[in-house]
Every structure is written in structure tokens, then in C-alpha cells.
Design a protein with these regions (language model features):
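RNase H-like, Mg2+-dependent phosphodiesterase core
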Residues: 1-200
Length: 200
């Protein structure tokens, strides 16, 4: 038995917080009608879909690269790092269940770029895969909901920025709050946080 694994990430564009990736191997009971691009789902429907994916997927894993790693590596490389961590989370689960060989025949990644997962792993990037490949759609949903929850929790830790509303994305209100009270500890210092600021 061999499986197809889908990987996607969320959080390239925000000014604050981590970039988050998910890797998913679907199960036969996973409802395919729920598996569409996470951006096309309302927050409530995303959470419903995420709960079903976690309940019915054969394997799933989440990977993170935090704001410090984003600043050190750049957002592209940090996203690839989060993807590798998500995939390795799945492989660790498989090994913990006694599997000597990782039974994944191919990994499909949303977008134009894919992470290096080792010579034994076939990886292919699929442009628009979050809307066409169910495994990637599922990963998109898990990545988005996991990151959103993290940002909502940080809204209470760092009040005044509105993280629960915009999840760190560069809205006008978010930029205004940065200009008013300065960046929080989880803001990405390598990003242009306010319009007049040059990225360093």
C-alpha cells in the first residue's frame, strides 16, 4: 500500500506571526465535498472541514517557521522549512506505528516550488493544486485553521493590534496600529510594516 501526500502552507503575506504548513494523507472516509481551497471557505466552514480532516485522515502533520526564522531565512525559505517539518511530522507518526518504510509514493505541493524531502521522496509542485488536488486542499485547510488559531491566541498576549481580526495580514487598521504603538515581538522585522518604512 502506498499513499499520496498533499502539502500546502498559510501565512506568506502577513506582517506578523509564523508561516504554517500542513501535510495530509487522506483516508477513505474523508468527505471529498469539503475539500476545496481554504480561501473559498468561510471561517466556520473551514473549522468544520478541519475537524473532519483530523478525524478521518490517515495521517496529518503541522509544521511551523516562526517570525524569527522568516526574518533570518526570508519568507520563501521559511515556508519550505515549515513544509519539511509538516512532512517529517507525518513520517515520525508512521515510524511510531511500526512502519519500517514510509509508504508515500508521491508528495504534491501547492504552488511553483517544492521542498527537498530527501532523495527517496518524489515531490512535485502543482500550480493551483489547492483547488484541484483533494490532498492539497485538505492541507490548505489545516494550515490556515492552525495558523488562525495561533494568531487569535496571540491577540490576548499582544493587545491593540487586532490579530484576532486580520490574523497579521497587512490591513489598513493593522498598519495603523503598528504606526501607533510600534511592532510587537512577533512582527516580522524584515517586512515593510508601515508604508513609509523600508524593509531591512
Amino acid at each position: 500500500m502506498s499513499y499520496l501526500c498533499g502539502i500546502d502552507e498559510a501565512g506568506r503575506g502577513p506582517l506578523a506571526g509564523p508561516v504554517t504548513a500542513a501535510a495530509v494523507v487522506l483516508g477513505p472516509e474523508t468527505p471529498r465535498e469539503l475539500l476545496i481551497d481554504s480561501k473559498r471557505l468561510s471561517p466556520i466552514k473551514r473549522e468544520v472541514a478541519a475537524a473532519e480532516i483530523r478525524r478521518t485522515a490517515l495521517y496529518w502533520g503541522i509544521g511551523w517557521a516562526d517570525h524569527r526564522e522568516i526574518d533570518a531565512l526570508n519568507i520563501h525559505n521559511a515556508a519550505l522549512l515549515a513544509m519539511r517539518r509538516a512532512y517529517h511530522s507525518i513520517t515520525l507518526t508512521m515510524r511510531s506505528r511500526g512502519l519500517q518504510r514510509i509508504p508515500i509514493s508521491q508528495v504534491l505541493v501547492d504552488g511553483k516550488f517544492s521542498p527537498d524531502l530527501g532523495a527517496e521522496t518524489a515531490v512535485r509542485a502543482v500550480v493551483g493544486g489547492d483547488g484541484t488536488v483533494p490532498e492539497i486542499s485538505a492541507a490548505s485547510i489545516l494550515a490556515k485553521t492552525s495558523r488562525d488559531r495561533w494568531m487569535i491566541e496571540k491577540d490576548a498576549v499582544f493587545p491593540g493590534y487586532g490579530f484576532a481580526l486580520h490574523k497579521g495580514y497587512p490591513t489598513a487598521d493593522h498598519r495603523e496600529s503598528i504606526g501607533r504603538q510600534g511592532p510587537s515581538p512577533i512582527h516580522r522585522r524584515s517586512f515593510r510594516l508601515v508604508p513609509s518604512q523600508s524593509a531591512s
